[in-house]
């Protein structure tokens, strides 16, 4: 009797495949709109295992507490200005409609009050391109270069997310990569299907390794692995598609 392949077991969602949420300090998001005003204080800088950037724990004057990504140069004890009237200084949380053009920002809200959706990875930032006060819209350029409009009543943090250059440092050891993957419940290492036994994968088995064949789109679950209904595969296929576009 065959077994369910690994992707089916992952899809079912067993405990060994779930991200360890009990290790998290808390969600990185702004307080509700009515609570984000006045001043806050950076109490602690934390390493969050499930995130790619340092996290700052901020306590407001009213005693409310929340987590936000740390800006480059942020330090413990720094005073954070929040809400309307805040100055464009690194680490301050401002209303998008009040941020000057050309300012670098991160953790940008798509809609007012959603807690932050854009530019949240280490070393990234968005740039304020312009304002549309008559439409309550702010034009920003994302790290990808895409230009979008967001709600001008939303919030963003001034500066660049700390931890830039993270991907430039090599892992050096497979063990470090293992622990990074384990913190996020990633599948590591990735084993090729044709290197497995026949009971574990449709491409497995044989006296020597052979490449798998494309699978029809009508194949049942468990058999549908590898390339699904592909017209061609390999480097030549990519080259041919590039020539067609030209």
Swiss-Prot record:
InterPro entries: NA-bd_OB-fold, Rib_uL2_dom2, Ribosomal_uL2, Ribosomal_uL2_arc_euk, Ribosomal_uL2_C, Ribosomal_uL2_dom3, Ribosomal_uL2_RNA-bd_dom, Translation_prot_SH3-like_sf. Keywords: Ribonucleoprotein, Ribosomal protein, RNA-binding, rRNA-binding. It comes from the Archaea. GO terms for cellular component: cytosolic large ribosomal subunit. Coiled coil: none annotated. One of the primary rRNA binding proteins. Required for association of the 30S and 50S subunits to form the 70S ribosome, for tRNA binding and peptide bond formation. It has been suggested to have peptidyltransferase activity; this is somewhat controversial. Makes several contacts with the 16S rRNA in the 70S ribosome. Belongs to the universal ribosomal protein uL2 family. PANTHER family: LARGE RIBOSOMAL SUBUNIT PROTEIN UL2, RIBOSOMAL PROTEIN L2. This is Large ribosomal subunit protein uL2. It comes from Pyrobaculum arsenaticum (strain DSM 13514 / JCM 11321 / PZ6). The gene is rpl2.
């Amino acid at each position: 009797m065959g077994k369910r392949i690994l992707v089916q077991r992952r899809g079912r969602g067993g405990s060994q495949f779930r991200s360890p949420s009990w290790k998290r300090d808390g969600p990185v998001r702004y307080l509700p709109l009515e609570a984000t005003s006045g001043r806050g204080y950076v109490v602690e800088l934390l390493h969050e295992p499930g995130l790619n950037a340092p996290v700052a724990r901020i306590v407001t004057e009213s005693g409310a507490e929340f987590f936000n990504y740390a800006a480059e140069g942020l330090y413990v004890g720094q005073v954070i200005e929040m809400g309307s009237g805040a100055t464009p200084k690194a680490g301050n949380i401002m209303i998008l409609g009040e941020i000057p053009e050309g300012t670098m920002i991160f953790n940008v809200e798509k809609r007012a009050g959603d807690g932050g959706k854009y530019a949240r990875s280490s070393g990234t930032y968005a740039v304020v391109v312009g304002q549309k006060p008559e439409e309550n819209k702010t034009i920003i350029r994302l790290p990808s270069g895409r230009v979008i409009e967001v709600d001008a009543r939303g919030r963003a943090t001034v500066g660049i997310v700390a931890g830039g250059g993270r991907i430039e440092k090599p892992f050096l050891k497979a063990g470090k990569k293992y622990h990074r993957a384990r913190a996020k419940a990633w599948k590591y290492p990735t084993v090729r299907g044709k290197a497995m036994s026949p009971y574990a994968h449709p491409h497995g088995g044989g006296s020597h390794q052979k490449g798998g064949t494309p699978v029809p789109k009508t194949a049942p679950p468990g058999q549908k692995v590898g390339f699904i209904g592909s017209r061609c595969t390999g480097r030549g296929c990519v080259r041919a598609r590039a020539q067609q576009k030209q």
